[in-house]
A protein has these predicted regions:
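Short amphipathic alpha-helix adjacent to the substrate-entry channel of hydrolases
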Residues: 167-189
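Short alpha-helix in the alpha/beta-hydrolase fold that links the catalytic acid
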Residues: 319, 333-344
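Primarily recognizes the serine-hydrolase "nucleophile elbow" in alpha/beta-hydrolase
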Residues: 218-274
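Alpha/beta-hydrolase active-site loop
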Residues: 173, 205-226
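N-terminal cap/lid segment of alpha/beta-hydrolase-fold proteins
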Residues: 111-148
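Short beta-strand element of the alpha/beta-hydrolase
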Residues: 150-159
Length: 398
């Protein structure tokens, strides 16, 4: 649930005007003005796309327009009025950040993400597309298939538009998980959200979790129609976990892996987020006050989220479930959600419900668990959790 309190980034990537070459990748820097330090992360792809993240502002995927790009230089502007221009030298982009005709030096260094998988891969990958005809959406994704794979998972991202790797701040958790699973004989299909990345069509501004669940259902149907796998499961992170139970309640999947998926009504989660993020401001905040907020009332996604109670779908889910949370998760708090899930999930000897000390919402080892740590942590996803996912799925085949 990477929508931080009251912030929704529903902006599409903007194509770059040239080849990224040596500058492709994620670059981080800190803008220092008087006593203020504002980190930025520039994500530049080899295919010619760019997004900008502002971790301390809890905003990501700001689209960047590239006015100039060469193998060692760039100039990126935004519709919200700031421009960055720099030149690559000795592995660092030296440049200036300009806004309102005021320029400040800011250097960008490459972001180190050691878990991101690199080719060649010992398994087959296919670029595929499937369609949610009712929504007019064509979803583009990557199918990773190791030799002899009998089991496949559809991977569903959290809230906000994201690519198939669930990429943020240079981290690519879904790519990391998919690679590890493929190396252990488990296939995956991960896809760009509707109207994002290589996916096209489908309403975005009016879409709710239920609409994104329809996209996921189309992916499950595509996998079943392929006839290549004996078991079709779903892995969902955050909002994707809620979607997993929506499909589980309909009997569409053979098993569920829920990573920090919500198990209580959205208004309770949002209230707890507020209390954790700004305890002094949330002292007198109530669920009733949140429901009266016009920003929530006028936003279809938030309105649905606030009123949706996943326990109805959880209670109707009969398939095996692995549900996990980091105990330092500040966005979908572990105790609140896992205890609720234990109460309502129908008994099944193959369930695994587990919390992990010291892990945040992204399943990184952390200090505070707050979102402003996500970008400064090198680890993308806990290997312990990945190994537990692999071992649990393997038990389902015995």
């Amino acid at each position: 649930m990477k929508r931080i309190v009251y912030i929704s980034v529903l902006l599409a990537l903007v194509a770059l005007n040239g080849a990224a070459q040596n500058i492709s990748g994620s670059w981080s820097g800190v803008l220092e003005v008087e006593d203020t330090r504002l980190p930025f992360v520039y994500n530049i792809t080899a295919e010619g796309r760019c997004t900008i993240d502002s971790p301390s502002e809890k905003v990501r995927n700001i689209p960047g327009d590239v006015d100039y790009l060469s193998p060692d230089s760039l100039c990126i502007s935004t519709s919200i009025g700031f421009v960055y221009a720099g030149r690559l030298q000795d592995g660092v982009i030296h440049g200036t950040f300009t806004q309102n005709k005021v320029s400040v030096p800011m250097d960008l260094s490459p972001v180190h993400r050691p878990q991101t998988p690199q080719p060649p891969f010992p398994y087959h990958t296919e670029l595929v597309k499937f369609t949610n005809a009712n929504a007019g959406a064509t979803l583009a994704g990557t199918l990773s298939v190791p030799e002899g794979a009998k089991c496949v998972l559809l991977m569903v991202t959290g809230s906000g538009l994201e690519n198939r790797d669930e990429e943020l701040f240079g981290h690519k958790p879904f790519a990391v998980i998919a690679d590890c699973l493929a190396r252990q004989g488990i296939a995956t299909l991960r896809y760009d959200d509707r109207a994002y990345g290589e996916s096209v069509g489908g309403d975005v501004m009016g879409a709710t979790t239920s609409d994104f669940a329809d996209d996921a259902a189309a992916g499950i149907e595509w996998l079943r129609r392929s006839g290549r796998f004996q078991q079709v499961g779903i892995l969902g992170h955050s909002e994707g976990g809620a979607i997993a139970f929506m499909l589980g309640a309909q009997g569409l999947v053979d098993f569920i892996v829920s990573l920090a998926g919500p198990a209580v009504q959205g208004d309770s989660i949002l209230l707890e987020q507020c209390r954790i993020a700004t305890p002094e401001l949330a002292e007198n905040l109530t669920i009733e006050v949140l429901h009266r907020d016009p920003r929530i009332q006028q936003n279809p996604w938030y309105s649905f989220f606030m009123n949706y109670n996943p326990q109805t779908d959880i209670a109707a889910t009969a398939c095996p479930v692995m549900a996990v949370n980091g105990e330092s998760d500040c966005q979908v708090p572990a105790e609140m959600n896992l205890s609720a899930l234990r109460r309502v999930l129908p008994a099944n000897g193959r369930h695994l419900i587990k919390s992990y000390p010291g892990l945040n919402h992204l399943f990184q080892h952390c200090e505070t668990g707050l979102p402003d740590e996500y970008d400064v942590i090198e680890e993308t996803f806990s290997e312990e959790v990945i190994n537990d996912i692999i071992n649990w799925i393997k038990t389902l085949n015995h």
